[in-house]
Amino acid sequence: MCGIFGVISDSINKADLKQLVNHSKQRGVDSSGLIYLKSGIYHVDRADYNVEKLLHVVSPYNSSVVCGHSRLITNGLGDNQPVVRESIAVIHNGIIVNEDVVWSNLKKQRHFVIDSEVIVAIAEEVLENGGEIVDIPERVLSLCKGVISCAMIFPEMGKLLLFSNNGSLYIGNKGLDFYFASERFGLDLIKCDNIGQLKNEDFKLLEIPGNRQSFAIKDYKIRSEDLIPEFKFISSEEKLLEHRSPKIKRCTNCVLPETMPFIRFDDKGVCNYCKNYRLRNVPKPKEELFKLVEGYRRPGKELDCIVPFSGGRDSCFGLHLIVKELKMKPVTYTYDWGMVTDLGRRNISRMCSQLGVENIIVAADISLKRRNIRMNLEAWLKSPHLGMMAMLTAGDKHFFRHVETIKKQTGISLNLWGVNPLEVTHFKTGFLGIEPDFEEKRVYSNGAMKQFRYHSKRFIAMTESLGYFNRSLWDTLSGEYYRSFTEKQDYYHLFDYWRWDEDLVNDVLLGEYVWEKAIDTPTTWRIGDGTAAFYNYVYYTVAGFSEHDTFRSNQIREGQITREQALILLEEENRPRYPNIRWYLDTLGLDYEKVIKVVNSIPKLYKE
C-alpha cells in the first residue's frame, strides 16, 4: 500500500516532481523507491526511509522518465519497490490477497516475499506465450484478488503501462509532459490538465526511451527497527495467558457482572444498565436517507461521497450498502496509525477491489506512533489502572481530523459512516470514576463538560505514573480534540437508517466478499485492530469481563440474542488471543513475558 507517481518529460519540472513526491508521503513513509533514466540506463534506487530524502539523494531531475513510490509497508520488509525481475519492473499500490494461489498456477519461480512480485511474473508469462503488453492488465486482474494500481516499466520495449482495478490511479498532462499519481489531488496540486481516472478496462500504454541494458539497482538500508515482526509460536508464552471463568454475580437479564463500574441490581437481580436502556437499533425509514443524499449525487462517474473505512466489519458492510443499496459512488478513506493488522488491510483490499472503489490512505509515521504507545504502556505497567487503558488507543483519534483533510482534497462534502450502534462501552470511562450517561444516543459525545470531567479525572490518574507525561501527550490531546469538539458537517450514520444485524453482516462479508477471519478467535469483531486483544485480555483478567460482554448485553436488550446464547459466545470470545497479543507487544518492542506477568499480577476486582 503506497502512493505511486511518475512523470515523462523532455525537461522535468523540479518543483512539480517535488510536489508529487511530497503528496505521496500521505500514504506512507516507511520506505521508498525511484526508477529513472540516467545516461541511457534505467536506475532503480530503493530506500528504507522516506521518499523526500531519497529524492534529495538521487536528484533525478535531468532524466526524461521518473517513477516512484512512498510506501506503507504491509509485507516483505526486506523487499522494496520497484520490484524487478529480469527486464521488467513494477511499482504497485495495493495488496494482493491470493498471491500464493496465483504463484501455484504459474511456471515462474518466486524470489521475494513481497506480494507485488507476482504481477511481474504474470507479465513475463504473457509475453513469453506470445501475448502483447496490452494483454497484461486483463491477465493480471483476472488472476489476482485485491487492490492493484500499478506502473510497469519495460525498458527493452520502451513502454510504460498503467492500470488499476479500483481507480486509485490518475493521469494528466501539462503541455507535452505526462504525469500520473495515486490520487487526483496530487495532479490538481501541480495544475495538470485533462485529468482522468484509470480503472478496470481503462489502461494507459506510453512510449518511453528504450534500453536493452539491465537495471542498475541500488538499495539504501539504515533502519534497525522491525516494522513487521515475524510471528513465532512459543508454547511457554501462550501458557502464560490466564483464562479463568470467575464465579461473578451477573445481571439476570443481560450478562454484565458485579465488577462493572456503577452497576446496581434490583431485588430481581436486574441491573441498572438494563433498566435505563433505550433501544438503539431502531432505524428511521431508509427513504429518509435516500432523500438526504439526493442533493449530493453527482453525474456520470464523478465520486460523490467519502466513506471512513477502517476495514472492520461495520465499515465494510457499510461500504456494501452504499454501493449496492444507495447506489452512490464513494471514495473510501483509511487512517493507518500502525495498529491496523495485516488482516485488516487485506480485508480493505478485498472490499475495494471487488466493489471497484478508490481507497485514499492517510498513514501516520508508524515508528513514531508505536513509540508513543510504547511509552504510554510502559507508564501504565508501572501503575496499572483500568481507567487508563484508553491511553493506549488515543493515537487513532486523528482518524476524525483527516476526514476534513480528505474533504478538502477531493471536494466531496458528504461522509457516510458505518458505526455499530451497539458498541457502547461505559466501563472504559467508568473505571476512571465517570458514571454512565444513560441518555446518551451517540457512540461519541462532544459535550464540553463531560470532556472536562473526563480529562480532569484522567490527569489525576496520570500523576500516579509520571511516565504518561511524555512526547506523545500532544498527539493524544489533539486527536481527542478533533474527535470530540470539532463540528461535524454533511455527516450521516448508515445504521440510523439500516437495522444492524450481526448475522446479515457476517453472511454478506463472508459469503459475497470472502472476508478473511482471524485465526485466534471465532468473532468477526475487532479482528483488524491490533490493540483489541491486549486490552480485552487486561479487562477480562482483572475485572472478569471485556467489551465483548457489554456488546452481547446490548444485543440481549435489543432482542437479537438470548442471555444463554451470549454466555456461550462469551466463553469463546473472552479466550486470550495469543497471536494477536504477541504481535502487539512485538511491534511495540516490549518483552512479552514481562508485560503479561505484570498484567497477571494485578489484584482482581472479584474474589478468586
Give names to the regions the model predicted.
Residues L77-N80, P137, L319-L321, H402-T405:
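Catalytic micro-motifs at enzyme active sites that drive phosphoryl/nucleotidyl and oxygen chemistry
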Residues H92, F309, T334-D336:
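Short beta-strand/turn micro-motifs composed of small residues
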Residues C316-K327:
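Histidine-anchored nucleotide/phosphate-binding helix
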Residues I95-I96, G311-C316, P421-E423:
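Gly/Ser/Thr-rich loops at beta-strand to alpha-helix junctions
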Residues I4, M152, L162, V307, ...:
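Structural beta-sheet core signal
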Residues E201-L205, G210, Y220-C305, E325-E608:
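Nucleotide-activated chemistry modules centered on ATP-dependent adenylation/adenylyltransferase
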Residues M1-P229:
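Conserved short alpha-helical segments that host acidic/polar catalytic motifs at enzyme active sites
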Residues S9-S11, C305-D314:
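Short, glycine-rich nucleotide/cofactor-binding loops
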